[in-house]
Amino acid sequence: MLLRSERLRLIGKVDEVRKEGDAAIAVQKKTGRAPRQGVWPQHRVQMGAYLLLLEELHPGTEPEGVIRYARAERRVTLNPFLRYEVLETRDRALQVLQQRTLPPRIDDEKRCRACSLFSLCYDDNKMRELGYG
């Protein structure tokens, strides 16, 4: 389900949204393993963005998040710290886009392979074509 807010300057595609009482629950499925505790940091921020979007799109509901890993299910709750982290991450991303400067590339292709931008970051010709490097 596509979630979008011009005011928040956020957009995201969550796997599922369901209503349970006063709660709007975002469900995101991940194929990898779960960390020993909680959720991976990037998954927490991603889910936090979905929760901010749900909060705006469904006023009066309590947004909740569930991340389903291959063998575990973890809950994510929107709190002031996560709200700040999501908005700070959004602001940094907008700044990168406005300045047309990219953060330094991590020289660990194995770590990056799951990223949707992997082929772009590791294609030096494409990066030059876009005006980076």
Which residues does each predicted region cover?
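Mg2+/Mn2+-dependent nuclease catalytic core
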Residues: 1-92
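Immediate flanking context of iron-sulfur cluster ligation sites
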Residues: 92-113, 129
